[in-house]
């Protein structure tokens, strides 16, 4: 499971002043915005920059480590993807596994998968998931309690920071909403960019899928997610990390540490035929 897929459930919920420049210290004294209004602005701004994201492709390198009950690594797998956006949807094309480029049948199978996904993305309105479920910011804020809003500087930029925790008594529908009730964490919102700069989330209780028959996510499972500005008005993911502890189908224990690094951002142009072939013609960003 990709780090961004895990963070997708909660990514929209998503130092000190000593020694900071004068501008940052002044910002720290400014009145805090209303958090629901701020998050609505974040959501609206994201819709505005979706087309701009489609001008970029980048590389995502992921390492997955399986661990035993004592925390010792028993297996390590790596994967490298070429990622790009179509109609507001992220498309991930696998190009390497365990350091070896995909070839032959594996490459053909991946091309077929990505081509179908691109076609589906072209027909799916932005904001609607290609797979699984989604949850709006306004709905998420109905499920979460927001606490301790404050100002901090994150990576040299002023941010609005707040903690959140799911309300156990909230009425929910669907997997994403049900999971949100058992999450807690902290989100850093870049004030100028209106983007989630950093997100840290953990499960504060067991979360059972299908009553535990399909899967159980244990308390303490956690993940983080980072974004950074690529150009004026555009932010893209730079990486993330997750520690997952749980069980599949009642019998198989799942203990994994997953890390992802996103890099090599490039400008590209997708032609009609290229979209159908799931290939991109890219040029390095100056």
Regions found by a protein language model. Give the residues of each.
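Bacterial N-terminal signal peptides
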Residues: 8-17
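Juxtamembrane cytosolic interface motif at the C-terminal end of transmembrane helices
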Residues: 19-21
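Structured extracytoplasmic
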Residues: 25-184, 191-197, 202-222, 226-239, ...
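N-terminal secretory signal peptides that target proteins for export/translocation
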Residues: 1-3
